[in-house]
Every structure is written in C-alpha cells, then in structure tokens.
Amino acid sequence: MEQQLKDIISACDLAIQNEDFDTLMNYYSEDAVLVVKPGMIARGKEEIKKAFITIANYFNHHIVPTQGKMILLEAGDTVLVLSQTLLDSDKKDSEYAMERRATYVFKKNAQGEWLCVIDNSYGTDLIGV
C-alpha cells in the first residue's frame, strides 16, 4: 500500500507539472476536497480541476511539486498521508510557502483504487491563518 500511494502521489505531481488536469482528476474521488489556499476550498472534480488551472496561471505555468519525507497512516480503507511537499516555480514572489507540511487523505474505492478525498497542501498551517 505504501509504495502504491507514493507512486500515485508522484503521478499526481507529474500531472500538475505537465498541466495534465484530466489525468490528475483520475486520482480524485467525485466528492473530493482541495484546499486551494487558506480560506478557499474546491469541492468535487469540476471545481478542483478549475482550481488547478488557476494555480497553474498563478505560477506562470511553471510549477514542479515534489514530495520529501512521507508518513502514511492506514486504517482499513483510509490512509492519512503526512508529507513534506516542495514546490519549485519561476515565480519567486509567491505569497504562499514553497515548502509545506501537507496532509492528504486517500480512500480505497469498491474497485480497489486509492483516490484522494482530501488534498490539503497547507497541512496544519491552516490553523494559524
């Protein structure tokens, strides 16, 4: 399970880098939630896809997300991923941190696929906002 989820997250990072948002949406549940930025949440695949397009525009179409150290906590069909997320971009004046302690929640569906249900790249930093 651990390597499978790390591979999924790497595939998501690559899809974001390549702005292949249709492929990216294959890794999200229909009712997924994405923390776009503090105070702004996208709900469902349609909103999430639009949010990623907006994020790509914000970073001048050059964002390279990678994951550092990860801890995965599994309980049945649910996994909490705690990850050091690193963002590289040509945009040097971002008002948002480029190194984050992200939290992701994945759930296994009836077909045995792991899908992201909560994508929060800000992690617990949301508490301080």
Curated annotation (Swiss-Prot):
Pfam families: SnoaL_3. It comes from the Bacteria. InterPro entries: NTF2-like_dom_sf, SnoaL-like. This is Uncharacterized protein YybH.
